[in-house]
Amino acid sequence: MNDAEQASIYCDAQHAGSLGPGRTLCRLVDLSKAETLLDVGGGTGAMSIRLLEANPKLVSTIIDFPNVAEIGWKFISEAKMVDRIRYIPSNALTTQWPKEQGAILMSYLFSGIPGTEVPRLVEYAFECLEPGGNLMIHDFMVKDNRSGPPMAALWQLQHMAFTPDARSVTPGWLRTRLNEVGFIDIKEDEMIPGLTKLIHARKPS
């Protein structure tokens, strides 16, 4: 995301493609008790915007690269969310995350980072959540036996062209990592049929 023109093209497409799944996410996860959301690698804020629309007392912090944050402010301003969304313009893998968060979202993040970082970020999310807080992981996922679905596999392959050391994450593998860290109430839902899944869980109160 260091090239401004490429970042703009990618972010515009990603924003449009995330608004629909954002509505689905609102139906699947109850954030009515949460007051703070950390959107890690949240791009231009499409998911945050949808979650804040559905939860009036929620405010969001998005961590993403500075040029992505600059593009995101356009969408956040159009959604009239400038007083409820803030950016930490930085690399989510290296910057410090705010603690005591009511919810943490990582959407399309794991498919675009080195696979060795995934377990560490799961542990860091647990650390940064308040007791009872929700973790939401949305991404391209193939079945545990890797037999499909074809579109999810193709999208994962496309991402690996840009991040060769990314990991092809499966729901079962991810559920095991969450359980090892200490998450409870681990659930799996389909977000975009045949393409993406949502794994969500809760930190014990």
Could you describe each region identified by the protein language model?
Residues 1-35:
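Conserved Class I S-adenosyl-L-methionine-dependent methyltransferase catalytic core
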Residues 36, 40-205:
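Alpha-helical subdomain
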